[in-house]
Structures are given as C-alpha cells and as structure tokens.
C-alpha cells in the first residue's frame, strides 16, 4: 500500500470510529462459513471504497479474520489482500469495469494455482450495506448502489450506525482454477458473478420496495375478483354498490400491514434490551439456509410453531439480525388492541379473523391481499398451528393459510415458493401458568393492554431461547411430485380449488409439522423435566439426575434425531447447574446429599417443557419399555412390536422415520443402549442390566402415558366394536381423566380430546377400523393385548374396573 493511502486511512479512522457502527452477518463467520485460517484469504468488495475497506478491517479484526489491509505473499512478492469487482463511482459518473489492479491480482493468483497444485486460496465476497431501508413502490434504484464522495458522506450521516458487514461463503480458487482455467476471462467471470451476488444480498437484506397503502387498496378494489364479489354482495343484499365498496375498504384497513422500517430499526434496540433482560442467550441455527433461499429469489413463507406471543417479536428480531427482511406476519385479530395493534401493524403484522365462514367479501379480500404480498415478493409468516400450544406439544396444522398459499401459486407466481419450518423453544414460556389454568377449565382471557402490563412486571431472566430453522419445503417441487398437472389449474382471476388441492395441502401440512419437530432444540430445562417427571414422587438425587441427563445426551449425540435438531454442547453437570439457577426445582439437602424435586404445581408446568422434546425420545423410550417389561427379549421381537406401535407415535408426535428406515434406526438405538450398559446383549437376545436398571426405568417411563392412552381407546373398541368416533373420543377422555386422578398423572394432555382424535384417525388409516368406522377385531385385539402387556398392573386394574362399571 502506498504511503498516501496509509496516511489517508489514518485520517479516516477517527471520524469513522464515531460515525460507523457495524454488525457482521454471520456473527461467527469462521465457524458458520467454515473459513480455514490456515489457507490464504483474499477479500472481494463490490466497489473501490476506502470507507468500505476500513469498515471491513475493523469488523475482520473483531471476528478473528485476517486484516484486509495486511498484504498477502505470493511466491515471495507482497500483494493487496483485497480486490474490487468494479471501479465504482466518480464525482459525476460510475465505472462498472473491473479495476486493472484487481484484474492483475486475479491473474497472478490463478496462475499461481495453475503452477502449484497444492495452492488453495479462499476468496471471500464481502459487502458493506449502508442501511437496509427498502425503497418506495414506483422508484427505480439499483439494489446495490455505488456512491461517490458526497453521497457516501451523506449516507454515513444517515446510516453509518445502521451498517452491516455481509460476509459470504468462501469461493475456492483451487476449484475455479481446476474447473474453469486461469486466463483473464475467468477473472472477469468471477467479478461478474460477485456483482450479481452482491445485488442479491442487498435485495435479501432490504426487501422489495414498499407499496403506498392507499394505492394498494385502490389496486385491490379494482381487481376482478374483488370487484365481482362486491357487485354480487350488493345485488344479494339489495344495497348500493358504493356501500359495499366502503365495507371492502374498511376490511382492507383492518387486515393490511403498515410496514415501517424506522420502527423495525428503532424497535431492534428495544428488543435487544428486552432479550438481554429476559434471556441469557439466543441460540440460532441453520440461518444460512434461509439466507441462501432469499438470495436465490425464493418467495419465503416462514411457518414457525407457536409457543408464546413472544414468538412474533423473536422471529422478526432474529431474521433482522441474520441480514434478512422481517416478514409480513399473519396475526390473530385478538392482538389488534391499543397500543399493541398499531405497533404490530407497523412491525409487519397483518390481521386475520378466526373464521371466514359466511363472509365471502372478507375471505375474497384476504385471499387477494395475501396473493398481492406473494406477487410483490414480500416474505410472509404464519403460525402453522393456528394458535399457541397450551401443552407444549406440536398441534395438528391448521391448513387454511397453507391452502391460500397454494392458491396464490395458482394465480401464476413466477418465483419459486418455499416453506421454511421454524422451531422456537424457550427455557421459560411467560404464559405457561396461564396455559395450565386454561387446561384446567379457566376461560381464556382476552388480550388487552392490562394483560401486557402485568406480563411486563414479571420480566426476569428466563434462561436460553432457541430458534432453529428446519429443512425448507419447496412447494413447486412438492406439487410437481404429487400433482404433476398442477400448472393446468393456473387462473390469474378466479381462486382455484382443484380435486387434488385438499389431499396435497394435507400432505404438505404434515411434512411441514414433521420438519418443525425435526428441528427441535433440547436444552437444560426440557431434559431435566423429562427425567424428573419420569421419577417416582418427581424427585431424584442430584447424582442420579446428572447420570440421567448424561444418558439422554449420549442418546441424542450418538443417534442424532435429525440433521436440524440441536443438542446442548455442555456436559450433564453444567446443564443441571444451569437448570437449577432457573429456580423451578425444590432443592433439599440431607446427610446423603442433595435431592432435586418438583412440587405439584411445578410438575404440571414441567410437562409443557418435556412435551417440547418428547418425540426425540419416543423410540429409545419404547425400546427401554419393552426390555423392562420382558426382562429378556429378542431384537426381532422388539422390531415387530415397534412396527405395530410406530404408526400411532408417528401421527401423534410427527416422527419422520419412514417404514423402511425403522429397522435400521431401532438397531442404532439398541446399539446405543448396549453401549451405555443399560441393557445386555447376547447374540440376538437382550436383557436388563441390573447395575443400571434405574436409568433404563426412567427412560422407559417417558412413553408410558402415551401407551396408557392407546390402551384406553383400544379397550373401549374391543368392548364396543361399533363405537363411533365421537363416542370413542368422549369415553376415552372420561377414562383418561379417571386414570389421571387415581394415579397422579399430572399432565393435562393425557386426557386431551384432540390426542384421541389423532388416534382414531390413525386407527382408520392403518386398517383397524372398517369403512363404517367399526373395529376390525382381528387387528384390534392383538394390538390391544401387546400394549396392555406394557402397562403396570395398577393401571390395568383401573382400566378393567372402569370398563366393568360402565358395563
């Protein structure tokens, strides 16, 4: 670097230290992007800019990356560690050519790779985004705009403290040299690809231009679909067309968002304070997959599970910090109260009524509004379960919004539409006490400002929060596979509902929920809750609890549930100490040590957290249950039993294993239990290991309540084969409540009618019921007997006594 540049950089650093405050995306690029610090690194920036270069320098040094202003040595000669892909702006024009010095460096590096087979330099495309404010609809500015000196100065004043250093995945120059050669044309190609990449990054970060709200309403009013229903409504109600048109405008006002970037930017500071006050940390996983989709131009639909009202804020906050545009969020109309409603609306919320039934005008307007969001390229978010889960389990999907998403595709969208399942988890859900009261029968309290204030007074440290992005689902690919002729149903005017729509939407919904559960985050509290709720009297010595946590951790690490599920990196001792600090357990000391237990109220609340991850342990728990019951059992017998029971677990817990994968995964779990010395193996025979029988019993207990529910329903079917769906659900629920009361099963979902509904549907799907819904006893009886054998004598006696009383 020349002396002049060195002096210039020194003079710039002081004002930039005051004017510029940057965040890096990703926040840990060395780990997230797998950057190898042992291999040479060269940075590629979009424009020649000393301000950008110094901003990158500060960020790189903070992140542990090489200083871009330190030279790189090639064959004994020192060269700059950076290239610019265009000369960039001058005072009155812009030169988009690749600078000669950058071209020369590219040629030198590529030739070095041609001459040295072991050379493998890393090219890291890096851009500095000065502000992320989207433009206004109708304006035409480039997505990544070069700035001359005066423009850059103004930008620093306006957005210097709202800047982002965007670091992209590494490009291997060894790969480029081997596959594309090392001549000058490749250098130009690299520069062109980088420019496209930088522009897509900018669009992904700021999003499409925002519409004028009134212009949007006028455009919707003129759409053929809404105009048609307005005329039909006026005619059927015998009122003036203008009156219906005003109603339509009022509905649009009720629904539509009023997105404000300034609220997002300023709200980010408040939310940062809030998360620091509430949580000891936020754990975000697999965000790079979503960034890639955004940069490739996908229409992204986020479909998170719904644990808490906090989900609305948390996901938008996380996406903003991951360099993505916060989505337009479908929120229940119950949240449209002052002052929260207007704030949510400016933060991207659009409001939806609980039911569209009988209101054709509303349903048409809402459908057209959603289609407009997709057509303009705004990312959208809606909660897959419809409402918040009160039990901690993933609920069956509500398919209305999903169906409208597919219908929007049938309007002729020219971009791929991709669902991004999101698992959101907490070590404390603020509403969990309220959920417990509602499950006991208390009426749900309507959301209001007073409720918000009461919640704010309870703010304290709630441990860790988790946002795991699951495996994306391409709707285009799914439709191509399951409805190959779907494009024939495209109609830009009328909403379509072809014959294939309902089964395809149901299939997508099930896949969506499965991918959410695949991305589950086990944590200190959920693991402790799982162990303590499996113990007699809901109590364990500290040593036993630590050992059980270690058992769970080994299962999750050695037989990973999925590629997107996450497991704590800490050991069992550290997890337990962290969980104890959350102040949810009773800690007692005696002469033998410490006992960790749950009081009755906390036992009820802890079922919520256990249910977050119960699916992770469904199969190992069932294997343990079979070994505990039989003392000695063959692997083949275990495989046969699990094949019978698995379809019910799969439907209830959204397990992802296919039938052909089941044998292999069961064998893997058996191997793990043998490895942990929980069971002993002699050839094909398994038996209890008395030295570790306590740990095996605790593992086995996790699935016990699920099997008890199955036994209840199957016993009713055996006794009354012609029992209808509603009667079976009602009678099973009554018996489950009796069992819960008599045997201290302090878990509200144990007698949840919805769970019995899923069981009934699975019985029908699997052929245990005939076309009329009557039990096929030749199939029901063997299954019922197999499951009954796994129950304790006390539970079996209670079920028998209740059935005798009913008779």
Swiss-Prot record:
Intervals of motif HXXXXD motif: 305-310
CDD domains in alphabetical order: LPLAT_DHAPAT-like (cd07993)
Disulfide pairings: none
Catalysed reaction equations from the record: sn-glycerol 3-phosphate + an acyl-CoA = a 1-acyl-sn-glycero-3-phosphate + CoA
GO molecular function: glycerol-3-phosphate O-acyltransferase activity
EC number: 2.3.1.15
Membrane topology qualifier: Peripheral membrane protein
Record localization: Cell inner membrane
GO biological process, one term: CDP-diacylglycerol biosynthetic process
GO cellular component, one term: plasma membrane
Keywords: Acyltransferase, Cell inner membrane, Cell membrane, Lipid biosynthesis, Lipid metabolism, Membrane, Phospholipid biosynthesis, Phospholipid metabolism, Transferase
Main location per the UniProt record: membrane
Pathways per UniProt: Phospholipid metabolism; CDP-diacylglycerol biosynthesis; CDP-diacylglycerol from sn-glycerol 3-phosphate: step 1/3
UniProt domain comment: The HXXXXD motif is essential for acyltransferase activity and may constitute the binding site for the phosphate moiety of the glycerol-3-phosphate.
Similarity section: Belongs to the GPAT/DAPAT family.
PANTHER family listed in its UniProt record: DIHYDROXYACETONE PHOSPHATE ACYLTRANSFERASE, GLYCEROL-3-PHOSPHATE ACYLTRANSFERASE
Matches recorded under HAMAP family: Glyc3P_acyltrans
UniProt protein name: Glycerol-3-phosphate acyltransferase
Species per Swiss-Prot/TrEMBL record: Aliivibrio fischeri (strain ATCC 700601 / ES114) (Vibrio fischeri)
């Amino acid at each position: 670097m020349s002396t002049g540049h060195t002096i210039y950089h020194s003079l710039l650093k002081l004002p930039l230290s005051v004017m510029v405050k940057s965040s890096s995306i990703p926040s840990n690029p060395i780990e997230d992007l797998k950057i190898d610090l042992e291999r040479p690194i060269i940075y590629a920036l979009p424009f020649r800019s000393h301000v950008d270069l110094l901003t990158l320098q500060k960020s790189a040094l903070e992140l542990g990356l090489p200083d871009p202003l330190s030279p790189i040595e090639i064959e004994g000669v020192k060269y700059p560690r950076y290239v610019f892909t265009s000369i960039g702006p001058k005072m009155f024009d812009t030169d988009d050519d690749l600078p000669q010095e950058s071209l020369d460096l590219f040629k030198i590096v590529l030739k070095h790779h041609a001459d040295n087979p072991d050379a493998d330099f890393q090219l890291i495309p890096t851009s500095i985004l000065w502000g992320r404010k989207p433009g206004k609809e109708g304006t035409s500015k480039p997505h990544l705009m070069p700035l001359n000196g005066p423009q850059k100065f103004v930008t620093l004043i306006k957005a210097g403290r709202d800047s982002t250093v965007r670091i992209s995945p590494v490009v291997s120059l060894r790969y480029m040299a081997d596959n594309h050669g090392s001549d000058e044309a490749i250098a130009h190609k690299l520069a062109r690809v980088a420019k496209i990449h930088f522009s897509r990054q900018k669009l992904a970060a700021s999003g499409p231009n925002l519409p004028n709200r009134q212009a949007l309403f006028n455009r919707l009013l003129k759409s053929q679909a809404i105009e048609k229903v307005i005329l039909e409504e006026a005619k059927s109600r015998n009122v003036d067309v203008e009156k219906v048109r005003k109603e339509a405008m009022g509905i649009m006002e009720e629904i539509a968002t009023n997105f404000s970037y300034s609220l997002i930017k300023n709200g980010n500071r408040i939310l940062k304070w809030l998360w620091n006050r509430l949580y000891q940390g936020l754990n975000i996983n697999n965000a790079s997959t979503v960034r890639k989709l955004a940069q490739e131009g996908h229409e992204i639909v986020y479909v998170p599970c719904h644990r808490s009202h906090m989900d609305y804020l948390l996901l938008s906050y996380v996406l903003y910090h991951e360099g993505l545009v916060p989505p337009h969020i479908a929120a229940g109309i119950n949240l449209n109260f002052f002052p929260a409603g207007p704030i949510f609306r400016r933060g991207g919320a659009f409001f939806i009524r609980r039911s569209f039934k009988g209101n054709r005008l509303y349903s048409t307007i809402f459908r057209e509004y959603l289609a407009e969001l997709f057509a303009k390229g705004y990312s959208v978010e809606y909660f897959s379960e419809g409402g918040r889960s009160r039990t901690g389990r993933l609920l069956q999907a509500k398919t209305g919004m999903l169906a409208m998403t597919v219908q929007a595709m049938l309007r002729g969208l020219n971009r791929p539409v991709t669902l991004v399942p999101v698992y959101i988890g907490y070590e404390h859900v603020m509403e969990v006490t309220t959920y417990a009261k509602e499950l006991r029968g208390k009426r749900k309290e309507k959301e209001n400002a007073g409720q918000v204030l009461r919640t704010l007074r309870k703010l304290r440290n709630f441990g860790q929060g988790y946002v795991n992005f699951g495996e994306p689902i391409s709707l285009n690919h799914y439709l191509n596979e399951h409805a190959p002729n779907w494009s024939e149903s495209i109609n830009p005017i009328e909403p379509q509902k072809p014959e294939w729509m309902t089964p395809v939407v149901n299939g997508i919904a099930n896949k969506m929920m499965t991918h959410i559960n695949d991305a589950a985050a086990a944590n200190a509290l959920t693991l402790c809750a799982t162990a303590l709720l499996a113990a007699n009297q809901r109590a364990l010595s500290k040593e036993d609890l630590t050992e059980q946590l270690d058992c769970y951790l080994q299962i999750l690490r050695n037989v990973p549930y999925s590629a997107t599920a996450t497991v704590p990196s800490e050991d069992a001792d550290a997890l337990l100490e962290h969980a104890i600090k959350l102040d949810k357990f009773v800690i007692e000391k005696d002469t033998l040590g410490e006992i960790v237990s749950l009081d009755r109220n906390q036992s009820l609340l802890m079922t919520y957290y256990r249910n977050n991850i119960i699916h992770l342990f469904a199969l190992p728990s069932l294997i343990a249950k079979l070994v505990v019951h039989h003392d000695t059992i063959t692997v083949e017998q275990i495989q046969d039993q699990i094949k019978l029971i698995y379809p019910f677990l799969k439907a209830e817990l959204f397990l992802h294993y296919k039938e052909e994968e089941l044998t292999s995964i069961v064998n893997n779990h058996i191997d793990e239990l043998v490895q942990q010395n929980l069971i002993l193996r002699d050839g094909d025979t398994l038996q209890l290991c008395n030295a570790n029988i306590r740990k095996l019993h605790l593992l086995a207990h996790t699935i016990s309540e699920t099997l008890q529910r199955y036994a209840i329903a199957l016993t009713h079917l055996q006794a009354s084969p012609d029992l209808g769906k509603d009667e079976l659900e009602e009678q099973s629920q009554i018996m489950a409540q009796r069992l819960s009361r008599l045997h201290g099963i302090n878990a509200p979902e144990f007698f949840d009618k919805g769970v019995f509904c899923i069981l009934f549907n699975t019985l029908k799907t699997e052929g245990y019921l005939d076309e009329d819904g009557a039990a096929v006893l030749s199939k029901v009886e063997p299954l019922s007997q197999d499951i009954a054998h796994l129950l304790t004598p006390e539970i079996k006696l209670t079920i028998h006594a209740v059935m005798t009383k009913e008779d």
